[in-house]
Amino acid sequence: MAYTQQATNAALASTLRGNNPLVNDLANRRLYESAVEQCNAHDRRPKVNFLRSISEEQTLIATKAYPEFQITFYNTQNAVHSLAGGLRSLELEYLMMQIPYGSTTYDIGGNFAAHMFKGRDYVHCCMPNMDLRDVMRHNAQKDSIELYLSKLAQKKKVIPPYQKPCFDKYTDDPQSVVCSKPFQHCEGVSHCTDKVYAVALHSLYDIPADEFGAALLRRNVHVCYAAFHFSENLLLEDSYVSLDDIGAFFSREGDMLNFSFVAESTLNYTHSYSNVLKYVCKTYFPASSREVYMKEFLVTRVNTWFCKFSRLDTFVLYRGVYHRGVDKEQFYSAMEDAWHYKKTLAMMNSERILLEDSSSVNYWFPKMKDMVIVPLFDVSLQNEGKRLARKEVMVSKDFVYTVLNHIRTYQSKALTYANVLSFVESIRSRVIINGVTARSEWDVDKALLQSLSMTFFLQTKLAMLKDDLVVQKFQVHSKSLTEYVWDEITAAFHNCFPTIKERLINKKLITVSEKALEIKVPDLYVTFHDRLVKEYKSSVEMPVLDVKKSLEEAEVMYNALSEISILKDSDKFDVDVFSRMCNTLGVDPLVAAKVMVAVVSNESGLTLTFERPTEANVALALQPTITSKEEGSLKIVSSDVGESSIKEVVRKSEISMLGLTGNTVSDEFQRSTEIESLQQFHMVSTETIIRKQMHAMVYTGPLKVQQCKNYLDSLVASLSAAVSNLKKIIKDTAAIDLETKEKFGVYDVCLKKWLVKPLSKGHAWGVVMDSDYKCFVALLTYDGENIVCGETWRRVAVSSESLVYSDMGKIRAIRSVLKDGEPHISSAKVTLVDGVPGCGKTKEILSRVNFDEDLVLVPGKQAAEMIRRRANSSGLIVATKENVRTVDSFLMNYGRGPCQYKRLFLDEGLMLHPGCVNFLVGMSLCSEAFVYGDTQQIPYINRVATFPYPKHLSQLEVDAVETRRTTLRCPADITFFLNQKYEGQVMCTSSVTRSVSHEVIQGAAVMNPVSKPLKGKVITFTQSDKSLLLSRGYEDVHTVHEVQGETFEDVSLVRLTPTPVGIISKQSPHLLVSLSRHTRSIKYYTVVLDAVVSVLRDLECVSSYLLDMYKVDVSTQXQLQIESVYKGVNLFVAAPKTGDVSDMQYYYDKCLPGNSTILNEYDAVTMQIRENSLNVKDCVLDMSKSVPLPRESETTLKPVIRTAAEKPRKPGLLENLVAMIKRNFNSPELVGVVDIEDTASLVVDKFFDAYLIKEKKKPKNIPLLSRASLERWIEKQEKSTIGQLADFDFIDLPAVDQYRHMIKQQPKQRLDLSIQTEYPALQTIVYHSKKINALFGPVFSELTRQLLETIDSSRFMFYTRKTPTQIEEFFSDLDSNVPMDILELDISKYDKSQNEFHCAVEYEIWKRLGLDDFLAEVWKHGHRKTTLKDYTAGIKTCLWYQRKSGDVTTFIGNTIIIAACLSSMLPMERLIKGAFCGDDSILYFPKGTDFPDIQQGANLLWNFEAKLFRKRYGYFCGRYIIHHDRGCIVYYDPLKLISKLGAKHIKNREHLEEFRTSLCDVAGSLNNCAYYTHLNDAVGEVIKTAPLGSFVYRALVKYLCDKRLFQTLFLE
């Protein structure tokens, strides 16, 4: 074999040398035959005649681009753009080659004459006449046919047979060959083949990309082949791109893309740039809810791109994809229910294939491989103030780094622009090597070398400067760091320095502030791939203009949206709503857009009075308003007239000018010509006040002016809310809650008695309802104690807000000094005296004030009396009610006394609205004002719910700031704490060194004035703790906010709330205020270890030396961030089954020390036989039920594990009454001033915007009460329930406001130590009759189903009938490497805290979902004033509102209330994940998200004692949510599981087995020990004393998995 191969090789070599003549002849013959075969194959190719005259070089271009054709160049026609015109015929033939012969084909915008000449009778051309050029082209094609026929006639020839069918078809039915309609509206042909095709030759530009897929589907197109012109350079910011091969060019102006030929001026085509870019970049073109057209690029030839669009069935994709662990039928159902959302998500994910694969980008853009886009740095010395256009150029990446790497080696002196330019020119030019000219490796345009050199030079200069600064570690000596930088730049640019400096700052390459400098080396280039993605994203975000509107309106709207597009989250801006609102209100969209951008970026100098710049708010803010001024007169009476009362002012409608300016005329005081008296409020319609708009939707002017306008609007909003509530009460007196009836009063004029008697008398104003049932605001006068009523009055409503003319008087006074409707800002010098607690601010005021010519204003009445008392302590009366006043007194009585003072002293001024401070300075006409306050203590709190109070308006603008850093009150240890809060050294004069102590108490039950007396002043953090202490018998208890500014010798600070409180944190101003009220001692009594205990412990450990020095070092710690490596499903490692009962007992005792030693078997008996003192509301007790009936006690199994679990209790009068007091009585009253109806509507709007999918917000027309819904409800009921409905005829209902009451006999275990000191109350069940449930149960079940279907399930989970596996799947896509804030909202007394406002919110949600108005009204009356009857215990009482624990809407109602509460307070648009279940919730936000004061909002608006706290791990419904780099796993709380193993209600062994099965269902994830370490961390975060628990987790798995072993945990 080897020999044969050797001989063959030798013969081959001889042949190559030509030594063998026979072989030579054979080779020549073979070469001839190959040439013949090649020529024959070439002849078999389709023949194309190229008639137009082109150059030889262009001939090569056409031949190489289309080797599939045999092209004959006749060069018999001279024409413009000859190559492009000839190539168009080749392009058409190339497209038609891809289609099976004879298949029905649509030529979109095609040449029907060319198809007729080819005899293609199966082609239909859509040739719409979009402009005159199309008409001309259509006529030219007809002329070409006539010319062809005339030549045949001249030669006496007939139409060839292959053309005759097409010509016959055109003669008989021209519409079947060509139509004048766009392809989107084409009616098509009547007879089609099985598969229909389409071609589009340079016609895609005029078809909107979003309509293309649907248009193809309407014509049943199988595949569409298309060709269009494009250039990669269009993605640069150049306005001109040339196509040299065909002699054409693109020019771009915004979204307008023009295509023209260089030598032709008439052919100019205009297209949409964004539309063309969509065809280039998009992969999928949706056609329907099921089918989509997928684009695939074929080839690029002579500036023309060929692609095809293939029709795909997406149902095949989804039903063919295997999904692990999902039921097939359930998956189909879910896909069909939410198809639109899932389809859009799938399309978006697929569209990114091209954009994320750089190799694909390089393939379709071959010229762009290894090319980068470099900006050209413009350093023009002219037009410094004008904005210069940005320029870019595309060059080789290798060229860029060759230059940069070389010039980086230059020394500092050698690094000049000239040297850089010289080097760039040298490597670009031709060089001579050994006498031979060599071309440069990089072909860079020489016209760009100077600009490129400047970019390279500046980039290198900044980079070297930054490196030098890093090396020198920013050591600055005689000059500042900023001066060094500018010296370097000046040396580099010499006389060009001012322009360069301005350009560097404008482009933000160097950022300079007063004390800081930042150097940012810009990105040298961007890749073509990045630019393609950027252009594509910007194009798809560009809205489609309404072609039905005029061109001018479309251009304005486009410009407006372009302005808005720079804002964050601009993709969520609803263009349709914005356009509609602008048209309705007559607002220029471009003006609205510019205002919005300026306001959001805080560069406008104005403030919009809405919370967020939504579409409607922006349009409403800029709505043109017509203001009308009411003419008024000012009466001036003589100086001998005495001071008139406010009642006289109202009656006479005149204001005394006595003392207004004294007896002298002041030029500084300018009184408005429009003086408003309180009479203007008399008999004004309530609708006028309630609907009265704010001062302006847009606050303009300086910051002080904006603050004044916001303050005036806040007064109007407060008055509006008070009037709205009175109007509601006067129409429905039954709606007054017994808990709040003391705040209101309703007087019946006809009956001459109080229907609801108010607690106080002498109200200044109220709301009146006349005989026509219209409501007005009236200023009240009295005849003795009786109200003087008008003839038409029917009822008068008053409230605690109407006792005085507070808001009315302040509004009158402030409006009276407005100048042309604008606040007048005083030129007085305002000095802020910022002092630490106890620095002697009041003492300083008394020492500096001259009571003869100065004014002292304080926020509270007690503070004013204290200042007067201290000022007059010497016996000489110098401080009076004229020069020492409260702020409210000064504003309400403005004009009744002296109005001009020399100096103003404002104590605790930072607790006031900044606008109020500005008004006080201006109205006092002082020349200097001193505002005393503490910047670290509690600031002004906006107590009008839903009123906008922008953050930047909260900063008081002053002329000077003085600091007081020596405290006269605080001991040394508190001074040490103050040094951590204030700038500068805080000193003290107190002789007390140590003053703090704390005590952890067992629970609120131990607090008693006898057994636990509290020393000194008693202070609490929350109103609920204050109310509890007052009910226990403690006196003189106040909250921290109430005692700010006061001083006490000894303080007892008390916290009885075990759940986290938001205001108790180290950063909270409440903590600072609470610890700085004493001079001698403070003791903290708390039920939990919190931030206060941590601070006090630290202070107790501070050495005496440090207390003398008052020095604090604060270090900053940084978090190391590590990127994830792998993501997937949970890793499973089976847990070893080890451990014993003693392990579980040990773990329980370590977590809850002492609970296992509690002997509570006879607590219920002790409760019955001992004397009890209970705080009971109005109720009826049947004392015959006080002795429970004797019952046989059931025997239960005894648990081996000792926990705090109790035996089931027996219902009775005392037991049920204690449970009712705990669960239903003494509900909190924390709510502020709330306009219930308007605020509820606003809250529901936020609820729907936050949680519901936009497309599904509209209610469905589905009958809520039907036979099917009733049958579904009955299937879920027990047989006993159905038996109760046997005699129900569904015609009449029992009383819907009557409820039954019972208790759950098994006490609920709490995972804390309260069992050691408290007798836990049982849970109650308040429920309707089954007959009522039979009607409303199916209704709300259907409403709940509709609500859950519309919820955005990808981000929110409403935990209804969910399994632990479903919870894991919901949280599985959380990225553990993305920093997140995990928030939990804990609400105490959730059910009984719900009042009228909560009901209004819930009813509004049900109504919007489609609840019938009649059923809604019946349901509403059944939840307002309700009666509870407990037949077992003999108790009857009345409750207002509250959540009923056994209602048909209990669970879903609680869930939507907590969700609505959170959506009204938190930025839900930034939420990553959120879950809600009853009163439990867990939220995942991006790290660093700003949150408002949750406790304040929950108190004032929702009446909730809410605490929002952050955690590292989520805890939801008794389960720990552990998210890791692979996904998420949910572990059941192991401590809760052990607590259940101590249950004392297990009846027998069968019951025990059922108990074990239920525990296995919820705790199955404990069998996976792969994430035990994470579980240890999560448990340790909640329970500080918990040890590492891997051993007990394994023990739990061991006993739960073994049926026999589990039986040993309980004894007979």
Swiss-Prot record:
SUPFAM superfamilies: DNA/RNA polymerases, P-loop containing nucleoside triphosphate hydrolases. Belongs to the ssRNA positive-strand viruses RNA-directed RNA polymerase family. Residues 72-280 form the Alphavirus-like MT domain. Keywords: ATP-binding, Helicase, Host-virus interaction, Hydrolase, Inhibition of host innate immune response by virus, Nucleotide-binding, Nucleotidyltransferase, RNA suppression of termination, RNA-directed RNA polymerase, Suppressor of RNA silencing, Transferase, Viral immunoevasion, Viral RNA replication. One of its GO terms (molecular function) is RNA helicase activity. This protein is translated as a fusion protein by episodic readthrough of a termination codon. When readthrough of the terminator codon TGA occurs between the codons for Gln-1117 and Gln-1119, this results in the addition of the RdRp region to the replicase. Residues 1380-1493 form the RdRp catalytic domain. Heterodimer of a large and a small subunit. Residues 965-1117 form the (+)RNA virus helicase C-terminal domain. The keyword ATP-binding applies. ATP binds at residues 835-842. GO terms for biological process: DNA-templated transcription; mRNA modification; RNA processing; symbiont-mediated suppression of host innate immune response; viral RNA genome replication. This is Replicase large subunit. It catalyses: RNA(n) + a ribonucleoside 5'-triphosphate = RNA(n+1) + diphosphate; ATP + H2O = ADP + phosphate + H(+). It comes from Pepper mild mottle virus (strain Spain) (PMMV-S). Residues 52-466 are annotated as: Methyltransferase. Its EC number is 2.1.1.-, 2.7.7.-, 2.7.7.48, 3.6.4.13. InterPro entries: (+)RNA_virus_helicase_core_dom (IPR027351), Alphavirus-like_MT_dom (IPR002588), DNA/RNA_pol_sf (IPR043502), P-loop_NTPase (IPR027417), RNA-dep_RNA_pol_alsuvir (IPR001788), RNA-dir_pol_PSvirus (IPR007094), ToMV_Hel_N (IPR049329), Virgaviridae_RdRp (IPR047310). CDD domains: Virgaviridae_RdRp (cd23251). Residues 803-964 form the (+)RNA virus helicase ATP-binding domain. The keyword Nucleotidyltransferase applies. Residues 831-1086 are annotated as: Helicase. Gene3D superfamilies: 3.30.450.420, P-loop containing nucleotide triphosphate hydrolases. It holds the Pfam family RdRP_2.
